[in-house]
């Protein structure tokens, strides 16, 4: 499944219309939790909302606006652009991440941020200095990250090197119980715990908690209901009210000085060891995280090499490179006026920053989805560097990550993962050309509906031309041949024709970019379903009563029924067409379907159709 889509459905969207139930379990009202709770949304997640769940992004912004109307200050906190552990970044990279995060916040919420949430609450003095220099007024930390947190939840005053910032420390025990205990099963009990917090002499006590948004609906099913019920109860509580950090700071400026415990985070008690080495933090016991150190060291070496390449190859007429990086932002705004080399180097820097996204080190194994993602950023950064710079940097990277070993011996080390998971992604333009060829041959009109984030596509005779949107000087030209057994190509052979002597590459249709596969599916499904499904199944499909997985299996079952009726030579193409749907969905036929195919094909005499299906399904059929 798509993780963002799942969590959006279970949590982020649910919180935008959180349900308040009456005593009989009937829906009484909905509340937009973003109007009542302080929150932060990472810029990269917000970017995903823009394309896949714009209504959720709109509800989040609306919640912040409603809080501003009610309180005078919005609920939203900014976040550094990438989810990086800022104390492990250079000061220059800290500044860029914070500036990019502030800019994204301003664009979305139409105001300057008062506060900034630090990824994993990872903090040191330099990080807070950068926040203060960039106009941030407060952040939120775990109580163990400062010495002597101020009493009654009041903000503390951090001062260092002439800079000052307010620090809120959340209620650690309550936050822990919300995340890891049963608090969300009893909104009344949650409300009671808040009411029992000791009162200050002046009658003002602040109770704040901090937890992941995924707590409400994913980690705890129906957690959104508990939060909605609490909000409803607090609305009618004469002795407590929902507020936000910025409002508290305005009404109760800090009077207690706090001392920072440097290089700490809320999710690791080992001085940021979780993102450096095998510190003992893990999801499951018994696994080794010795891979963390070589992964970070390899990427640090590469980042140093990228920065050095920028210093060496940056065009003098483009101005100061690091100021230009900050100004261009993650979307490379305004780079059209820059020389091509400057644009390429800025793009390389964007990927160099993304290489340190914290989740790559958080979990248990090198072979999980997260480490290959940061390595793909590394591969793209290398691809953008000048000739002669790229090769030694890549060799040094591989030498270091070769020391990183997966806990599964079959998965190998960092080099094996680079070759298996990363180099495939590095062939992005070729895979895109393969997908465009498939669309051209199946449903050419759909090319008008193909919207790609990074490329513009043109057809010029037999050539497929790809033009990069941000680097218009990056143009590639391809020829492609498709191999069709069903309705869409099983595989595509592509060859770059603007460089002499380039060998053809071969791609299964399952690896072409998702926007292309979605258009191919939209064209293929009606053809396959009309040929294979019965009237009742088609009606269930139209009514949304037949899930995609069930529809694929029903189509495959229907195709085999046609083979039984019309023979393999006549109906084998329909079986291939049904299998095309699995490929386009990047799904594998279940074992039962493979066994059924073996039993259907084994008694039949050898034929090209039989052999092709056996090859596609990895069947070792008897020869006669």
Protein language model features and the residues they cover:
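Catalytic alpha-helical scaffold of carbohydrate-active enzymes acting on polysaccharides/glycoconjugates
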Residues: 4-114, 122-176, 188-203, 221-224, ...
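Active-site and substrate-binding clefts of carbohydrate-active enzymes
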Residues: 1-21, 44, 153-438, 516-525, ...
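Non-catalytic regulatory/linker segments of enzymes
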Residues: 60, 77, 84-87, 91, ...
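C-terminal amphipathic alpha-helical interaction region
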Residues: 389-496
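Terminal end segments
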Residues: 463-553
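Eukaryotic RNA-binding helical-repeat scaffolds
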Residues: 533, 537-624
């Amino acid at each position: 499944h798509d993780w963002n889509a799942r969590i959006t459905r279970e949590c982020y969207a649910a919180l935008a219309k959180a349900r308040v139930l009456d005593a009989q379990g009937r829906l009484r009202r909905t509340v937009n939790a973003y109007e009542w709770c302080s929150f932060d949304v990472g810029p990269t997640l917000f970017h995903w909302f823009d394309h896949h769940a714009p209504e959720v992004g709109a509800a989040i912004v609306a919640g912040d606006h409603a809080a501003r109307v009610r309180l005078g200050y919005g609920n939203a906190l900014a976040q550094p652009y990438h989810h990086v552990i800022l104390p492990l970044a250079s000061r220059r990279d800290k500044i860029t991440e914070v500036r990019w995060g502030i800019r994204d916040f301003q664009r979305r919420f139409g105001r300057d941020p008062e506060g900034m949430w630090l990824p994993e609450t990872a903090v040191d003095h330099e990080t807070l200095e950068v926040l203060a220099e960039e106009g941030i007024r407060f952040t939120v930390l775990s109580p163990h990250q400062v010495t002597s947190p101020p009493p009654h939840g009041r903000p503390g005053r951090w001062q260092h090197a002439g800079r000052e910032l307010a620090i809120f420390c959340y209620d650690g025990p309550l936050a822990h119980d919300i995340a890891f205990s049963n608090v969300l099963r009893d909104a009344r009990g949650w409300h009671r715990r808040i009411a029992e917090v000791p009162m200050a002499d002046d009658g003002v006590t602040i109770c704040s908690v901090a937890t992941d948004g995924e707590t409400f609906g994913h980690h705890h099913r129906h957690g959104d209901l508990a939060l909605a019920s609490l909000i409803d109860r607090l609305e009618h509580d004469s002795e407590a009210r929902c507020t936000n950090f910025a409002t508290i700071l305005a009404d109760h400026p800090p009077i207690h000085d706090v001392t920072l415990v440097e290089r700490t985070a809320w999710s690791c008690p080992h001085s940021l060891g979780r993102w450096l080495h095998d510190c003992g933090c893990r999801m499951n016991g018994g696994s080794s995280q010795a891979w963390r150190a070589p992964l970070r060291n390899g990427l640090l070496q590469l980042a140093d090499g990228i920065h050095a390449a920028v210093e060496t190859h940056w065009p003098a007429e483009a101005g100061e490179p690091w100021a230009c990086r900050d100004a261009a932002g993650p979307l490379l705004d305004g780079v059209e006026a820059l020389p091509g080399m400057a644009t390429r180097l800025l793009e390389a820097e964007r990927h160099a920053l993304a290489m340190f996204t914290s989740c790559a080190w958080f979990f248990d194994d090198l072979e999980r989805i997260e480490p290959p993602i940061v390595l793909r950023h590394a591969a793209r950064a290398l691809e953008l560097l000048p000739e002669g710079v790229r090769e030694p940097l890549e060799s040094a990277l591989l030498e270091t990550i070769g020391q990183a070993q997966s806990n599964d011996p079959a998965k190998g080390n960092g080099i094996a993962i680079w070759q298996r998971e990363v180099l495939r992604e590095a062939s992005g333009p070729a895979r895109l050309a393969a997908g465009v060829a498939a669309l051209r041959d199946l449903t050419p009109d759909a090319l008008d509906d193909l919207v790609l984030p990074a490329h513009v596509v043109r057809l010029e005779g037999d050539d497929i031309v790809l033009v990069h949107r941000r680097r218009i000087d990056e143009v590639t030209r391809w020829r492609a041949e498709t191999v069709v057994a069903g309705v869409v190509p099983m595989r595509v052979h592509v060859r770059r024709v603007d460089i002499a002597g380039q060998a053809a590459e071969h791609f299964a249709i399952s690896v072409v970019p998702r926007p292309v596969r979605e258009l191919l599916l939209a064209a293929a499904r009606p053809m396959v379903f009309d040929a294979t499904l019965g009237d009742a199944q088609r009606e269930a499909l139209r009514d949304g009563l037949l899930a995609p997985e069930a529809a694929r299996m029903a189509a495959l079952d229907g195709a085999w029924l046609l083979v039984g009726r019309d023979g393999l030579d006549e109906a084998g193409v329909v079986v291939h067409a049904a299998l095309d749907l699995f490929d386009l969905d990047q799904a594998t036929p279940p074992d039962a379907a493979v066994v059924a195919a073996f039993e259907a094909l084994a008694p039949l005499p050898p034929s090209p159709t039989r052999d092709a299906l056996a090859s596609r399904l990895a069947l070792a059929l008897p020869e006669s």
